[in-house]
A protein has these predicted regions:
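Extended, folded cores of ATP/NTP-driven motor/assembly subunits in large transport
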Residues: 2-423
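Hydrophobic anchor at the beta1->P-loop junction of P-loop NTPases
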Residues: 461
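Conserved lysine of the Walker
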Residues: 469
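Post-Walker A helix-loop "phosphate-sensing" segment adjacent to the P-loop in P-loop NTPases
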Residues: 479-489
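A short helix-turn-beta junction within AAA+ P-loop NTPase domains corresponding to the substrate/partner-engaging
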Residues: 505-509, 719-732
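Conserved P-loop NTPase
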Residues: 747-800
């Protein structure tokens, strides 16, 4: 076997022939490539995304991302809109030249079939499955007519350069906290995203059909895959000048040419109103203030030099030297104004790139979507232009990674950038046990709420006759009945709820002077109060009851209160010693306990009670003989008459409070709907007790709702402040002009918001939940069984 001699390093290598050189160059080119990515993963321009949300774009560039929610802007008070705009300006001014900011607004379609299934109410094999099916159909119809097939999300990505990941993390964390502070001042909910959330967003962009994202950090090491493999599309094709292929879909990236002399704060919102899949990105790069001022001064110097040349030319030609080309004069004035803004006002200079990414199933649909977006730009005197041979760079720049490879930029000041307000209207779309409350009239999205999760779930429904107030209550009752196991009680002064309660197999308790249904106002249970003794709160109720019975503007005197309290303690002593139904006192026991004190004040109270104990209005002087353990109970008090109606409402409220205290120990909520609620607050004697109960309901798992058409009476109550402060849910339907003015002042409604309660159709108005005010519409189709059992129109009421 012959040996090959290995040449020493000092030996001169053999000279290559021309053919050998060409062969080697070909091999190098083959393996080195032309710099173009050959895989979908290679197009995604980052090196790594870490679990804490830091993205390493290259060796020295790092980014983090904040997800933020919408807030009510377009319908807000003018001063609120101004404040939001100023806070946006502050946010942009915070960003210096070392921080690149990217705002991303993603409208992504979800699987409509899976999305619709999430609104299905499962059948339970009882008599209400047909109603469940009909109610589900109503929800799914509203879903189809609205925009809820599109999930709208908003992101702010900030990018910096650093020498190491450790240094980058420290600075990114600090910047993130500062930016969250700015969002908080705007009343906007925001949070810094972790790595998995950022990957899920990328996956959603690359998989527009809503394919579920499956990923776990523990999968990376065993599989040998990178995070890109979990988010990349099946294919990317950039073979044409103005479109690209994304899996089985087509996409196009366009840039916005800002030609308008003035910009509108509604332009960005109009881009996002489209019902197609769209991704809008704003890349904002601050320019160092000193450098910006120097640049503008140089421009002014150049313009002045051109002006001098034009003046010399004018002198040589023999015409007036003050006559200059109009463009030159305009540019000179604009440059000086810009310099003045930077030097004397809180303005900075930014370079803005505005990109719009459309994705569709077909080229024709893509063309239509791009045309629609271009129409929005045209509306504001701007132009949307497709990128030529830069679609790949456009796609990369549309990913919320903080990278901008499109160098088509427009210089704008702080206020010009902030005019692209990223807010429209706040959505109310809670998950979990949320119930349907209508359609957001501004965004056409469904309103899904869980009142029990609110700080104070108590609510009010206010509207003129015929505005849909009763329908609103009944719609909520149906939702509670079908989707929860909660108890529901109704105080029904007009006997309007009977058809609904009967169809849902509920119980109607008819209270009247001639009825045989009796409810004892002195009923009590051992859980009646938080205190060791339940008598303290019950004594308050009896005092309110007696005040209402005795009438008068001054209420009970101090001695009268004392004798009543003494009598209350006496009549409950046997029951507290042995809590059985036989020992439960009734009004005649209270009457006798007052007489037994042999005091003039006690006798005076006893005489006032005579009418309700042994007189013609003794309907409440009986032990309770109705079973109120049905989960749906309506108290029909229509025939109580004017004299007894207020007493009846007070007694019903107390009965429901007793049920609330029982249900709390079982972990069950209790809903209470009080129609003509103003009657309880109109009289000072009952207002204080009602306000106290209103406050206590929240702690004990109660969800009360007061409904009335007499807004003036309601708002004139001395206790209305307590009621409003403890009510985080208010439905405003059509209002009379006087009531609308009062409500607008009380609830701080803007002029635009007031339009939704002025001559509005039945079932339309404003919904206030915590600090959110939304215009809504909640129509119930007339051809449904639900409508027939809920309507109160005489021509539509049917016998069941």
């Amino acid at each position: 076997m012959s040996r090959k001699t290995i040449p020493r390093e000092t030996e001169k290598p053999k000279k290559l022939t021309r053919a050998q050189k060409k062969e080697i160059d070909a091999v190098i080119r083959k393996y080195k490539g032309d710099g173009k990515p050959r895989t979908a993963q290679a197009t995604i321009p980052y090196e790594a995304i870490y679990p804490d949300g830091v993205c390493r774009i290259d060796r020295r560039t790092f980014s983090k991302c904040i997800a933020f929610e919408d807030i009510s802007y377009q319908l807000a008070q003018p001063e609120t809109r101004t404040a939001i705009f100023e806070h946006l300006c502050d946010l942009y001014n915070y960003v210096d030249a070392s921080i690149h900011v990217q705002l991303s607004f993603l409208n992504r379609k979800v699987d409509p079939v899976q999305y619709a299934k999430s609104f299905e109410i499962a059948p339970q094999g009882d008599d209400f499955d047909d109603i469940r099916a009909e109610y589900t159909a109503i929800l799914q119809k509203q879903l189809a007519s609205g925009n809820n097939g599109i999930v709208k999300t908003k992101y702010l990505t900030f990018t910096i350069e650093a020498d190491s990941p450790k240094t980058a993390r420290a600075r990114l964390t600090r910047i993130g906290l500062d930016l969250l502070g700015y969002f908080k001042t705007m009343g906007c909910v925001a949070h810094v995203m972790d790595g998995q959330a950022r990957l899920e967003v990328l996956h959603g962009i690359f998989h527009p059909d809503g394919e579920p994202f499956r990923f776990d950090w523990d999968w990376l090491a065993p599989s040998g895959l990178s995070t890109k493999d979990f988010v990349a599309p099946s294919s990317l094709c950039f073979g044409t000048a103005k479109t690209f292929g994304l899996g089985g879909k087509y996409g196009a990236v366009s840039f916005l040419q800002i030609l308008a002399p003035e910009l509108s704060d509604e332009m960005l919102a109009d881009f996002l109103k489209t019902e197609s899949g769209i991704l809008v990105n704003l890349h904002v790069q601050a320019i160092d203030q000193t450098e910006a001022i120097k640049t503008i001064k140089r421009k002014i110097t150049d313009l002045d030099a051109m002006k001098i040349q034009e003046q010399k030319k004018a002198v040589r030609s023999g015409y007036d030297m003050d006559i200059l080309p109009s463009d030159l004069a305009t540019y000179g004035e604009d440059a000086k104004k810009l310099l003045n803004k930077l030097q004397t006002r809180n303005e900075r200079l930014f370079m803005l790139t505005f990109l719009v990414l459309n994705v569709a199933d077909t080229k024709q649909k893509l063309g239509n979507d791009v045309f629609q977006a271009a129409g929005v730009a045209q509306k504001y005197n701007c132009s949307l232009v497709r990128l030529d041979y830069q679609q790949e760079q456009g796609l990369v720049s549309s990913l919320p990674l903080g990278i901008n490879q499109i160098k088509i930029q427009r210089s704008l000041t702080t206020s010009n950038v902030a005019v692209f307000v990223p807010f429209v209207t706040q959505e109310l779309f809670q998950s979990g046990a949320a119930m349907y409350y209508g359609i957001n009239a501004k965004s056409h999205n469904m309103i899904m709420l869980d009142r029990k999760q609110a700080r104070c779930p108590n609510g009010l429904k206010l509207g003129t006759p015929g505005s849909g107030k009763s329908m609103s209550c009944k719609s909520e009752i149906v939702s509670v009945f079908l989707t929860t196991a909660d108890d529901i009680f109704i105080s029904d002064p007009e006997a309007e709820y009977y058809p609904l309660v009967k169809r849902l197999h509920g119980q109607v308790i008819k209270l009247s002077p001639t009825s045989k249904d009796y409810v004892n106002p002195l009923d009590i249970n051992l859980n009646y109060s938080e205190d060791d003794s339940p008598l303290a709160l019950k004594s308050d109720f009896v005092l309110s009851f007696c005040e209402l019975v005795m009438g008068g503007k001054t209420g009970l005197e101090a001695i009268e209160r004392t004798v009543i309290d003494r009598a209350v303690k006496a009549i409950y002593r046997p029951y507290l010693a042995n809590p059985c139904p036989e020992n439960m006192p009734i009004l005649s026991d209270l009457h006798q306990a007052l007489l037994d004190q042999h005091l003039p004040e006690a006798d005076r109270v006893a005489q006032a009670l005579d009418l309700y104990v042994s007189g013609s209005l003794n309907v409440f002087n009986h032990k309770t003989n109705v079973d109120i353990h049905n989960r749906l109970v309506a108290f029909d008090i229509k025939e109580l008459g004017k004299q007894l109606k207020k007493l009846g409402m007070l007694i019903i409220q107390d009965q429901i409070w007793g049920r609330v205290t029982q249900n709390r120990s079982q972990g069950r909520a209790t809903w209470y709907f009080a129609d003509e609620f103003h009657l309880l607050l109109k009289e000072e004697q009952t207002a204080a007790y009602s306000a106290e109960i209103w406050k206590r309901f929240r702690k004990w798992g109660g969800v009360p709702t007061g409904a009335t058409q007499n807004v003036k009476d309601l708002l004139s109550s001395p206790e209305i402040e307590n009621i409003l402060e403890n009510s985080d849910f208010i439905t405003l339907l059509n209002q009379a002009s006087g009531d609308r003015k009062i409500l607008s002042e009380r609830l701080n409604l803007s002029a635009d918001q007031q339009k939704y309660i002025d001559n509005s159709e039945p079932g339309e108005g404003l919904l206030i939940f915590e600090n959110v005010v939304l215009p809504f519409s909640n129509p119930i189709p007339k051809n449904t069984q639900l409508y027939k059992i809920m309507t109160t129109r005489l021509s539509e009421v049917v016998e069941l």
